[in-house]
Amino acid sequence: MRADNLLFSPDGQSVALIDWQGCCIAPPVFDFAYFLIQSMTIEDRQRLEDNLLRFYAEELERGGLKISLPNLREVYESSLIYSFAIACSIPLINDPSIPRVRELAIAMGTRSIQVLKDHGQI
């Protein structure tokens, strides 16, 4: 999650999240995976990933969408490359000479490569 994508109400009591960067038709798990990979440190994601996947499955079921944890994991793992693709696009659609853009691209790329390694995809 990036602060650029948060809209706060004038009184500071509510917040909205927007992001039009990756508009596509895909399973909702793609958004969850992208959020998990790109909003946490590598160490935190590695430590919390299983618990957060379980929690996500429980919340989906609570909302009326029953999905088994093994099925959710399968879809989650199929979505990991999406995060890498978005990371690769950062220096292409932004000016990489800007330090903030460069730092973002490096962080996103590093996180994306590590999750692919962690799941045996590279």
Where in the sequence are the language-model features?
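Regulatory N- and C-terminal appendages and interdomain linkers associated
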Residues: 13, 70-122
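Short, glycine- and charge-enriched coil/turn segments that flank and shape catalytic ligand pockets
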Residues: 11-12, 62, 66
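A short glycine-rich, hydrophobically flanked beta-strand micro-motif that places a catalytic Asp/Glu
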Residues: 6, 67-72
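Active-site activation/catalytic loop segments of kinase-like enzymes and analogous catalytic loops
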Residues: 25-64, 80-100
